[in-house]
Amino acid sequence: MDQHKTPHESVNAMSQTTLVYCDAPSTDYIVADQSLLPLTTCKADLHLHTTHSDGSCTPIELIDYVVNHTDLQVIATTDHDEISGAQIARDYAQGRGIDVIIGEEISSREGHILAYFVHERIAPGMSARDTICAIHEQGGLAVAAHPYDWMVRSLGRYGLMQRATGIQPEWAFDAIETLNSSLFPRYANVTAQRAATALGLPMIGGSDSHQLRTVGYGYTVYAGRNASDLRSALRHGRTCPAGANWSYTDLAVATGRLVQRVSMAGVSLALRSIGLVS
């Protein structure tokens, strides 16, 4: 059986689990409260990159891989500050049994913000508040990406808990990414889950994949069959992040590709991909 089909079976065997935290990448799984969901569920990887930003696969290669090597039913292509790759992926996926959400990982001044269900590119470099407003103006959903990742500019460093509550409620997120398969050390996911719980916000999971080998490692489980059902599940707080961490080999490969990008494309592209410049 394909390795990407195993996590779903493992997740279904667990219920009433606040968070199972495992430090054995690719074999043990992080699971949130599966008891919220019925048996009929859909799997969506909501954090994927292509060659239209800093990923190593084209949008077409991504769709072919998802269809042939995973049991994902929905994906969101979320290139850095760009939606052209997502549009290509969506068009190519027509009739192939996979729903593609137009997404973007936007480099706001305070950190990365994931936009879903947008139709126009949102420019980087705005404040988090203005970025969220721009997403909502398009009818999209705004999600705090890896908010406690210490390696990139992240919203947790700029007061996520204070700004998203009644104290300073300008950060009106629709959800928080509480399972990002790429994070190392792993406690950043645990901290994000605690923040989402405290704020009463839905949680999502994604692989943050920049290469095909890690597509589907992290994902979001919800009741439904398609992207439209995912939007509804997020609105009602009925999503469940689950999946595996990147292995140390995956991390090494990703680091090597970052070094290669620096040498081939210049420092600015690499720095933009981790949110240090806009």
Language-model segments: which ranges?
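An N-terminally biased module of ancient metal coordination in phosphate/nucleic-acid-related enzymes
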Residues: 1-110, 129-132, 213
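Domain-core and long-helix interface of multi-subunit machines
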Residues: 23-35, 48-53, 86, 119-221, ...
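Beta-strand-turn-beta hairpins that frame and shape the catalytic cleft
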Residues: 39, 110-113, 137-140
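Short, charged, surface-exposed secondary-structure boundary motifs
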Residues: 109-113, 214-215, 231-235
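An anionic oxygen-ligand recognition environment, strongly enriched in 2H phosphoesterase
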Residues: 116
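Acidic, PIN/NYN-like endoribonuclease modules and their adjacent C-terminal/linker elements
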Residues: 224-236, 240
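A short C-terminal boundary segment appended to hydrolase-like catalytic domains
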Residues: 240-278
